[in-house]
Amino acid sequence: MELKCRINGEEVVLCAEPTARLRDVLYKAGCHSVRDSDDAEGFAGSDTIIFNGELKYANFILFYQTEGAEIKTAESLLNGRELNYVQKAMVAAGIVQSAYNAPAAALILTWMLEKKPHPTREEIKEVLTSIFIRDAGYEHYYLAVQLATELRDFGEFKSEIAPSFRPHLEVVGKPCGKVDGAALVSGEPVFVEDKVPENAWCLHVLRSPFASAYIKSIDTSEAEKLPGVAAILTAYNTPETHYMQAGQGNPEPSPHDRRLFNMKVRHVGDRVAGIVARTPEIADKAAALIKVEYEPQGAVYTVEEAMAEGAPLVHNGEVIYNAGAPDDLAAFNKLAGDEREGKVVYQFPLGADIHKNIAASNKGGIGDIEKGFAEADAIVESTYQTSQIQHTPLEPHVCYAHIEHGRLVMNCATQVPYHVRRIVSWVCNIPENKIHIIKERVGGGYGSKQDILVEDLTGYAAWVTGKPVYYRNTRAEEFYANSTRHPMRVKVKMGGKKDGTITAIFMEVCANTGPFGNHCLTVPMNSCSKVLPLFAVDNMAYDLKVFYTNTPPAGAYQGYGTPKGTYGIMMTMAELADKLGIDYRTMVEKNHVSEGYMLEILKGLGEGREGNVVPVGSCGLDEAIAKGCDMIEWGKKEVSDDPDWKIGKGFAMIMQGSGLPGLDHAEAIAKLETDGTVILNSGGADLGTGLDTISAKAVKEVLKLPMEKITVVSGDTDSCVFDTGAYASSGTFFSGNASLAAAKNLKEKILQEAALQMDEKVEDLDVRAPGEVYSKVTGNAISYGDLSHAAIAGDGRGQMVAHGSYVTTASSVPYGAHFAQVAVNVKTGEIKVQKFYALQDAGTPINPEIALCQMYGASMKSIGHTLYEDMKLDENGKCINANLTDYGTPMIGEAPDDFKAVLIDVEDAYGPFGAKSISEIACNGAAPAIGIAIHDACGVWMRSWPMTPEKVLKGLGKI
């Protein structure tokens, strides 16, 4: 049908089906700010518009209802290309990060401020209940509103946006807004979905209803007859290449234990067939016509079931080692089962035994653990269990692939463009020079987009059909067909003396990797390697085993194992302090590491090889603990006016890493253009974290150019150079250092060229703002533009281009302490987080406003994991809450009443400008801090996630 309405002040005529969703119509009409994060569930708010003067979800309005309507989208906020006052304030406040629904948030806040020019905190909170923010948390949204009112009323910001650091630097350590902030908050077409042409074919995946079954037969004949079906891909017509989906560098530490399509499905939602069709409707019809005959097999869902005698085996095929094969491999492989099991290929030994469902194992330690326990006055041994958690990025997994000049070109939302290229090359048997990966802006990743979960099949489908192919996960598929956080059982035994000295620690970790071994060794290793080095204890040991099961797959998630290990060890430490009758704070301060302490425990905690033993570098633990204890008034017992509510306090010390020393590698190229501007090509992948801004700031500090004369191009495998990727908190440390190296090397080339053109000595020259070389001796100067123009003249020496590379074995470790005050209702079991304070040492925070928002966002995720989030599986392994509403992601109403993030000022010796990582560590503290606070309030030790009212009441003996 055809109808008239007004969109952003312009009368338009639109044509669509009467029952089409208005969101889809608006998006096709060019309103890219109106996005869909929840498949029309009405949870995320990414589709928010103003409809006849009121905020509405566009997915809830059908096309026929829009006749004569007045519609405004976020595009209406712009004046030409200029942002409105709310959008400017959002960028300044640091909340425009992955930004998939940032335009919707800007529209919501603008609408509110037009109705209520000076809203209260409660009024801001009320209007933001309609939008889900996963990346930046909610706290700085209050600041953004304050900044917006100041800009509107006074023409400038008056409030402090964030503390500033390093006064000798111009932009590093100062809030100045992201270089891509305007594009993101205004709704520019910067995401993968915005690059998909009208003629793209869709890819639909038919998935298994069984948790474990052999495929006996697949009949696709009727489906293939449908007009508009280009191909149906199955295990029968795709490569038998085994590979891993984990986006990790060489040597790959995850087993190659899957194909594009397996002859044995290993979880509900596993791939059975891929349908390339002209439209989603045709694909759905084709899927219904495919006839699959299954042979259901026994399944295991927990580590306890997986390790049981006679348990069904998740993998029971041939095992291959590319290095380090055991002597009994031939005998081992004689026990292999049905040929439909496939293979498991190891690049090196992982301590695996698939005949016991063990995907990986490792053990080690320092000192004499038994001697340490013998010296203890008290010993506590406790077990803590974590749940299966979904990342829930606002942008689901998505990929667009097409053929161009005989090459496979892929637009991806990925953290690891170079790993995507390598793995797609392997799966499709295409040389890497025939693959071009373009990393678009990423609408949230948190580790899930480190894994190659959709790019493998999308790329293959486009390559074999020659069609432009678009694939996008449904929100339900995000839960049952994607990666999740590894559920873990962490058992900690800890001994201590009466004075609080810890004499020994033993950690036993049992992790559930699901049906495939993505990150199966490295995530559980992190639960030890980013936890045990917090302790200055002579006797420590660990024993970890990782089990295959038939649950939805596990993979990388922000924190990467550390939140689970931290939860177990800090809770046990609090239990030990309680048993010894000493103050928990005293025990923490007595036993944590400090600068210079040699971390011998790291020797056994490498990724498949010996780890680097290094001393503790810059460490802000003392200050973080002391300041946090002052803020929360540690030692003061709070009493509620209502006797049913009991109040308690807790905290946890935390650490992470800054990339993987000895494994990670980053590169960048800096080019001086003919007008004196600079383009920096970085291999790094900005996920909304401000990495491109860090790179631009590095160039600014070195070359003294205005920020607007610096452009950063990143994550494009054709135009950029190699970078391991954005994971393991490597962005600032590795990619930032590579950009800094490129800028410094370009400065050297500029000075050398200037010395020739100016007839001066190089050592007499330097650079200064606004972009020129000057002589410290003669006072002569030449602009970068004049210098570059002359260099590329016919008799010049060519364009000045510099390469920067960064590798290191040095370790820059961020530290911190997270504090919680909770109230527990001893009648209902309800838990309220009243206060949450995150104090972190990040070295020099290059983008302090963005750093604070990353701390808020990661802390909110961690609070969600602790109290609300939990993937629930039925008895057949099917996820029964595969949507955002039922899953339990926290919204603004679940945010702590008093929420603060504090940057502890230390300077690191190795990071760019003294910086360390900031975001991932903030996932580690909430569970133990809240758990210890709950015990302080009501005496119950919460031994599993999520910490629910039912568990409180059970602990109190009331149910």
Which residues does each predicted region cover?
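Signature of N-terminal electron-transfer/Fe-S-associated modules in redox systems
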Residues: 1-161
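Short beta-strand elements
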Residues: 49, 56, 183, 189, ...
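Glycine-rich loop/linker segments at domain edges
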Residues: 94, 174, 180-186, 250-251, ...
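Flexible, low-hydrophobicity surface segments
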Residues: 149-340
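C-terminal catalytic domains of large/alpha subunits in multi-subunit enzymes
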Residues: 235-236, 429-434, 464-469, 498, ...
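Phosphate/diphosphate-binding loops
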Residues: 271, 278-279, 467-513, 737-766
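Helix-loop-helix junctions that connect adjacent transmembrane helices in secondary transporters/permeases
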Residues: 316-428, 594-677, 697, 880-894, ...
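Thiamine diphosphate
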Residues: 422, 441-466, 470-472, 691-698
